[in-house]
């Protein structure tokens, strides 16, 4: 399908953003669950993995697995193009698919007859998602960009037999949400194809080579020897599925619901792509969120009367049910696609609006890794992260610097978070440079076609800080124009941008729909005057400091950068760098990652993050006391990307004549402070930044004296809030808090995908004194053990200076640690046992595990 570009992003334009295509055929009006027309089956379990030392070992292991058609090991121009792509492909870019990718030749039996080989005997059992790099020893030779963690080459194998629900004439494909990176896939010794990019999903047809009555062996080789400038992880780190359909079926990513609004009338006009669709007819229904019919069967288009709009507070999702009948009128395929109805616009003078309501994008940039999990992140862990960011006041996420996962976008759709979905970092100057020319167009196509049904997405970023901006020639501009035009053909409803650094906005400002500024906010004022029709937003902002000059990043002042956005209507919003600590781009050794974000790896809010509560939620009562002092043992960040060192404790070194700075972040009108033998008058705090109290922050210098600092906040003359800093006693106990009263089991292998993802519990461990208050300044070794129907995914703190990311023990950090525990496939109970250095008895917590609903 080739779309003509319309005038995008006006108030009358409705985003055709919809939820991800759900491939499992749900019970409905057209078919029964007993005989599904299509299946999406869980394929995460029963995998084996082997990390190879070098290419020679890779070749040997693959040969022992019965494979003779080797992967391409080089990075030269002869490297293969990514294959087996799915979704809509423009005619001029079909060269990105190879013959090997679609499986040409006659099927044969299982390689080695399913017998154990020397290579397979050395493989370890793993389940997907899986990141092999995070479990490797820290190696300073690997460099700080990768978090000092190695990559290398790895091989996955999986032996499986088809379930009886798959009929003899069904088409069967394997789908990977992502695999990092340079994936080569074989089935029963036959190469199915390649997929080079490590951040997009891909599907490979297994039908020609399947052994339908016996065992099959799937083999995946990944090569992560090229380093990126942050931690990428390594492995099949997103979910895998079997896709089962009839010969005539809807393509994966093949439903695109086009929703428009003209003169107040909403219309849905779905576009459907079929495989072997000769003689087929397509019809649709629209269901509400409860499954009741909203629009009866139609083909072509239909009017949606008074739809319930998708908003940040009410992210309502409809269901588009698509049915395909063959020439005889027999139903051959059916699928449900969730979508949201909403409009948005960017304006050069007024910024951003959603459903006609002006608002600022209060955004955060996110890398996809999570602490000890690396990039293999269970859905529940990501849900907890995104919910915490929304509760903090964030309303938009930038997927830095790669396409987000389908599961991530599903969560944003249901929580009501907006998304800037990003294709690449650096273009040809980055780690992907050897493969960029042959694969980039297909990679962008995959991102847009697979994600355009998500109402959360409002912007496509075609690149970040691209090195081509430095070139004097027009290569970078022409590449941006090509990518921009491609995106608009695939989705004419969302704007594009390049996130630019060092004042290169002019180079791409006439190409993309929006102009992204990484820092350099002062330049935006001048650019708005020079180019009044451009639509501007801050794609990266410091978390604490503000820039001073137009073209110099390393010139800053201590001021909350949000107030620049708030004070300038033409700025659509900003995205903090970054929202949550991440591996790689490491702060000075011994830190193994970036540790200057509002949230640490455990998702505990830093005291410094209080800086943003009055800025992002000025209408909510808030008061927070912190101490700014270099006595606290914290990993420091990089230059002005870091926070000043702060903590919310009064357990600090005391000495005569020593003073410390107290900071009070508040939305109160005034605050009364109390200190032993001392008090001062009420201090008026105005609702906006003033010369007296900038950034809603009152600062005091107080003696470092044993006792208590108390602050009482007043609104309209009445006390409404209080906070205190108090000396705490010695560690006397442990508090264990679990975020889930119970868990559900993991889904069974080859079962229907979907259902509850509440299979991970987070247990917060807090050291407390005899009165139950947190003691932050007495670190203790904590050891955790898990028994029963659960496994310990990891134990960690907010300290990135640890020596590795495996094991069951860790030193507490400011009195805290976190456990992540996952259920198994069996019902029962999980018993968590925790011992603390210096405490005589262990502590226990029981978590019930229930069956899947």
List PLM regions with ranges:
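Extended carbohydrate-recognition surfaces in non-catalytic/accessory domains of CAZymes
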Residues: 34-175, 233-236, 623-638, 645, ...
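Substrate-binding clefts and catalytic carboxylate motifs of secreted carbohydrate-active enzymes
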Residues: 39-59, 71, 179, 227, ...
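Extended acidic/polar, glycine-enriched regions
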Residues: 211, 271-347, 703, 715, ...
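Accessory beta-strand-rich segments of carbohydrate-active enzymes
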Residues: 145-252, 277, 417-420, 543, ...
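Short flexible loop/turn segments that cap and initiate beta-strands
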Residues: 222, 280-283, 313-318, 659, ...
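Short, hydrophobic beta-strand segments
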Residues: 206-208, 300-310, 698-704, 806-825
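Beta-strand-rich binding/interaction modules
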Residues: 265-298, 320, 660-684, 708-713, ...
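Active-site-adjacent substrate/metal-binding segments within catalytic domains
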Residues: 123-124, 129-162, 166-187, 193-196, ...
